[in-house]
Amino acid sequence: MTEVLHFPSSPSASHSSSSSSSSPSPSSLSYASRSNATLLISSDHNRRNPVARFDQDVDFHASIEEQDLRRRSSTDGGEEDDGGEDQISLLALLVAIFRRSLISCKSNRRELCSMEIGWPTNVRHVAHVTFDRFNGFLGLPVEFEPEVPRRAPSASATVFGVSTESMQLSYDSRGNCVPTILLLMQNCLYSQGGLQAEGIFRLTAENSEEEAVREQLNRGFIPERIDVHCLAGLIKAWFRELPTSVLDSLSPEQVMQCQTEEENVELVRLLPPTEAALLDWAINLMADVVQYEHLNKMNSRNIAMVFAPNMTQMDDPLTALMYAVQVMNFLKTLIEKTLRERQDSVVEQAHAFPLEPSDESGHQSPSQSLAFNTSEQSEETQSDNIENAENQSSSSEISDELTLENNACEQRETDFGKYRTGRLSDSSQQVVLNLDPPAQWPVGRTKGLTNLSRVGSRVERTEAWR
């Protein structure tokens, strides 16, 4: 964009033109020369940058118009007043500002459109490095590893006496989020047969051995062969050394007021999620111990007694002892509830998968009916003749009922003797009665034997063979 300015070539021409118009002032001539010089100097730069050239052209034209207005106002000073000059100059200034704002917006838009971020080139995947606060940098190349191996950063220096929030957590088989160290000690205890050890969680190991194993656990190592009583003691010590015990969020009054199983369950729901998960893990651990009561001599009361002092912290020893008794009853109730739920789940699974399908009318096959009759008879016989693990929890109740029924049957069966050599075969689920009568039946006993067909109940039929 070029503008040609015409200047007078000789003084005569300028003098002749002064009659028709006013001669240009020296200031206008100097301004024109400066403008031409500016155009000549910036021509090379404008040729390289079109946006800058466009901006300078607009600025130049705005300045030219402004100078023309000033020159006209100076030549026509007698014709217009000062108010008109101010309005014209203000209008010219506004027009120049408006044009400059439009031009700047257009130039910024063009610059943004011209700026495009391209895809990276010559990319090479060297390594994938992740950071774990417990294991440090994982996947770091060898050349970037420090020469001196340092310990992996961790939120805590030890695994005993620290909060669960600063420990590495894992999920157990029941979905409880508990510290990993507890799961490691539990697996080690189970693999070495700790549940079958007599007095587990009641007998203590030597202090020197426990301290040595504790140091190895703090360094992150699990010894291969550890005494099961040492492991049990460390599990109790972990709960005992917590900064905030599992049941500290509950007041002693709340625990003491719980008298029924439903109240205990409602109280467990008041625990925070972390403490509730730890309590559920501990209850299931104690329930696993109680299931081997016939080997380890630890029933629900004994295991609850040894765990109760580790579940709470109190300053007064006398108050702590009294409170531990209430905590023991609380834990004992939860353990028995867990054992009962396990037994019910086993029974439900047994009913969910019958041995043989029934026919369309709903009647069972003969072998299935015989199996059910056998199971019913086995529940009413003495527990010494049956080796079924599913009926161990209810053996005492069944034996009490059988005692009353046996007394009634013995009074009705005094007129004949009892000959029995029957045995129960658990593998075939059938009752095999081997009746070997004596060489000669006693006189007067045949009438009693014929009365067996008229015995109404199943119990009387069973007791008649005795």
Curated annotation (Swiss-Prot):
| Annotated CRIB domain residues | 117-130
InterPro entries the UniProt entry points to: CRIB_dom (IPR000095), CRIB_dom_sf (IPR036936), Rho_GTPase_activation_prot (IPR008936), RhoGAP_dom (IPR000198), RopGAP1-5 (IPR044785)
- Please note every region of biased composition (Basic and acidic residues): 65-74
Chain residue ranges for the region called Disordered: 1-31, 65-84, 354-402
- Identify the PROSITE patterns for this entry: CRIB (PS50108), RHOGAP (PS50238)
Domain Rho-GAP intervals: 162-342
Under SMART domains, the record lists: PBD (SM00285), RhoGAP (SM00324)
PANTHER family this protein is in? MKIAA1688 PROTEIN (PTHR23177), RHO GTPASE-ACTIVATING PROTEIN 1 (PTHR23177:SF64)
Q: What is this protein called?
A: Rho GTPase-activating protein 1
